[in-house]
UniProtKB/Swiss-Prot annotation:
One of its GO terms (molecular function) is tRNA binding. Tetramer of two alpha and two beta subunits. Binds 2 magnesium ions per tetramer. The gene is pheS. It comes from Salmonella choleraesuis (strain SC-B67). It comes from the Bacteria. Pfam families: Phe_tRNA-synt_N (PF02912), tRNA-synt_2d (PF01409). Mg(2+) binds at E252. This is Phenylalanine--tRNA ligase alpha subunit. Its EC number is 6.1.1.20. One of its GO terms (cellular component) is cytoplasm. Belongs to the class-II aminoacyl-tRNA synthetase family. Phe-tRNA synthetase alpha subunit type 1 subfamily. CDD domains: PheRS_alpha_core.
């Protein structure tokens, strides 16, 4: 007990001399640890008469508290000094130019889809969607393509079983729409479709958009006028356009639509036709009262023609050098 004041003074001196937190912790252990000087002072209480022990214990505890407060204060000083030193070493030169955040951009196929949806939206078309895993009825039968029809062989279909498949066209959306609502109908149906083919101009998955109008007094003239306006708007040119007779099981008459390319050659861009009466009957619409036209086009093909892309596979390879050109 006689050395208590001296111990506190020595502890204070050691605390002030500690140059970092590690050295300060050594001082704490020396004086307040399990075998520290002040801790050992508590053991001397057993040598005192019982009536003196409470007062003596209070004095020792006060000394320990004094040392602990000094330790806390010094630790705060050392940590603050260390932080200031680190901040000084990490000073940021605010005069340097900042790092520019590079803006992203839409994929070229997405840009094409958005552009087409915007055009037809102004004509009163609404966007309709449907399942990508389709059944045999909606993908083929309802579209006037029964099981024995040779057109099925042209689709290179991915089958799950005898009746389930990955849709080969978005025409199933038209069937579902016509079964769900009565005319007038005016929709476009964008979406992914699947065919078992892969080369420079074909991929197993690609994007298609189909359009459909069903109403009274719809004629081939309406179809031609709509597609003329669309193609000239899409390519932003007064294009030379021709309609070639063709065959699709779900339209009659049917046509392929070509545009004149910059090289003086005709380029096929889409297929179209008047909705076949059998298709209307299959969905419960009377072909004696209503008529309609439909058209379908590949989004990748239109994107290739619009931007001069020569390899369809470029759209799916995620090459930033390619994609950045469309920002």
């Amino acid at each position: 007990m006689s050395h208590l004041a001296e111990l506190v003074a020595n502890a204070a001196a050691a605390i002030n001399q500690a140059s970092d937190v590690a050295a300060l912790d050594n001082v704490r252990v020396e004086y307040l640890g399990k075998k520290g000087h002040l801790t050992l002072q508590m053991m001397t209480l057993r040598d005192l008469p019982p009536e003196e022990r409470p007062a003596a214990g209070a004095v020792i505890n006060a000394a320990k508290e004094q040392v602990q407060q000094a330790l806390n204060a010094r630790k705060a000083e050392l940590e603050s000094a260390a932080l200031n030193a680190r901040l000084a070493a990490e000073t940021i030169d605010i005069s340097l130019p900042g790092r520019r955040i590079e803006n992203g951009g839409l994929h070229p196929v997405t840009r094409t889809i958005d552009r087409i949806e915007s055009f037809f939206g102004e004509l009163g078309f609404t966007v309709a969607t449907g399942p990508e895993i389709e059944d045999d009825y909606h993908n083929f039968d309802a579209l006037n393509i029964p099981g024995h029809h040779p057109a099925r062989a042209d689709h290179d279909t991915f089958w799950f079983d005898a009746t389930r498949l990955l849709r080969t066209q978005t025409s199933g959306v038209q069937i579902r729409t016509m079964k769900a609502q009565q005319p007038p109908i005016r929709i476009i149906a964008p979406g992914r479709v699947y065919r078992n083919d892969y080369d420079q101009t074909h991929t197993p998955m690609f994007h298609q958009m189909e359009g459909l109008i069903v109403d009274t007094n719809i004629s081939f003239t309406n179809l031609k006028g709509t597609l003329h306006d669309f193609l000239r708007n899409f390519f932003e040119e007064d294009l030379q356009i021709r309609f070639r007779p063709s065959y699709f099981p779900f339209t009659e008459p049917s046509a392929e639509v070509d545009v004149m390319g910059k090289n003086g050659k005709w380029l096929e861009v889409l297929g179209c036709g008047m909705v076949h009466p059998n298709v209307l009957r299959n969905v419960g619409i009377d072909p004696e009262i209503y008529s309609g036209f439909a058209f379908g086009m590949g989004m990748e093909r239109l994107t290739m023609l619009r931007y001069g892309v020569t390899d369809l596979r470029s759209f799916f390879e995620n090459d930033l050098r390619f994609l950045k050109q469309f920002k």
